[in-house]
């Protein structure tokens, strides 16, 4: 998620380079150090298969995990406003190589998952908090053909995210093949 973000804070200039692709600002190590790593069940509706209904929760493994702090505007070139923030790095500008890539880059960021926040967790302990008003931390996003998570799906025995992503890649390959086989106008 950090590598694919257009902007990352809590980092030093010359530290982590970004390649971009997701119009988001991430907050690095949002949950703390490695010793504060944890696992949490996540509702991931995008994993539902046709006719299945709500899928079972996915066990997210969060290790020094970032969160999406802000969805940034989709714009050409670098995120100039972000580059002026202290302790923030931005990805270099990139150009689409063809129409399919251009369409993917122009899409807006979709929020695919949130981790319920502190208020939601406290509400289950009898503390008088309106958990409905807190939406939680953004932990999975997609923009066009770029997908990023705060958690490590590869560290679980649950293959659903990998299967879903392989289907997304296959659809993108088919779309590119179809676009290349269409006659030029």
Residue ranges and their predicted role:
Residues 28-35, 40-185:
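Amide-donor transfer/coupling interface in amidating biosynthetic enzymes
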Residues 1-48:
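Cysteine-nucleophile active-site neighborhood
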């Amino acid at each position: 998620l950090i590598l694919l973000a257009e902007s990352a804070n809590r980092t030093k200039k010359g530290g982590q380079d970004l390649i971009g692709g997701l119009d988001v600002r991430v907050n690095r190590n949002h949950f703390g150090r490695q010793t504060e790593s944890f696992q949490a069940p996540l509702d991931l509706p995008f994993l539902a298969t046709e006719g299945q209904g709500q899928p079972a929760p996915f066990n997210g493994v969060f290790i020094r995990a970032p969160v999406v702090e802000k969805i940034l505007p989709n714009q050409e070139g670098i995120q100039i406003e972000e580059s002026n923030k202290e302790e923030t790095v931005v990805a270099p500008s990139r150009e689409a190589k063809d129409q399919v890539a251009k369409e993917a880059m122009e899409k807006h960021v979709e929020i695919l998952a949130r981790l319920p926040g502190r208020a939601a967790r406290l509400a289950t302990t009898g503390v008088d908090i309106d958990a409905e008003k807190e939406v939680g931390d953004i932990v999975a996003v997609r923009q066009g053909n770029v997908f990023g998570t705060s958690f490590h799906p590869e560290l679980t025995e649950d293959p659903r995210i990998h299967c879903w992503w392989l289907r997304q890649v296959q659809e993108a390959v088919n779309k590119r093949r179809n676009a290349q086989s269409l006659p030029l106008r």
